[in-house]
């Protein structure tokens, strides 16, 4: 996993254990796939029966290839569905190792399968097949929309987890050190290539400057390097396209007045390493405030009131995750 995707081996170990835990969970959940009897006011009884939907086509991403593949494989098998998995191009070997574990555990080869190939060709063929009855996809919003259109032709069920752009609300009554202890590692986990990664930081005026300074100091202390080395806290980005894409968003923000307090460029002359980056005073019209960077970039903006915080957090049509740090359980 580390060799293919780049994340530190400590994070990779956590992903492996997490993937195994999913199989344990859904193995137990299979016992609870029971129907219900509904009694109507007229005395009639309706029986609800849960049945397998049928063969599933599952498409998983490269950021958590084992965990997210397991999150599709395990529930499908527990529900009694066969499944064909299309792994990401960047991480074929670790996904194949997972499938080998499934087959070695006794799942028949005609029940769980894996296919490799050009993504668009594979997805078009599988989704158009009358055999496939459900599609599961984790990835970007544009690709998700494309797959939904393909699925619509066959009126097929879809389950999708698409992009996010998680807001972080930091109020001036928070325990600042504890907040930083939590949020800095969370931001740079897997080099920021996490769909629920904290990205848009809205910090109350009273602690804004201090928060930016302390966040920047901690960011500069991160060890970036080979994921196989024990000291490494952040590895490279996943492929050659990512550094350029992240750099373009940062450059656009800087051109529009944002202040880069640390990072902002590639690290080293080889590989896909990108320096952990903090950008302060980011204007709302910067592309990075609307487009998920999916990289090691934290964007900071000051805020004055709770109403402003809620407004800014909800200004984008993305859900998936949000963070808030305060000592008050109820604010108003």
Segments (PLM) and residue ranges:
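Rossmann-like NAD(P) dinucleotide-binding subdomain of oxidoreductase/dehydrogenase enzymes
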Residues: 35-178, 303
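Aromatic/hydrophobic pocket-lining residues that form π-stacking "cages" and hydrophobic walls in ligand
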Residues: 23, 72, 98, 147, ...
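Bilobed periplasmic-binding protein-like "clamshell/Venus-flytrap" ligand-binding domains
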Residues: 256-262, 318-326
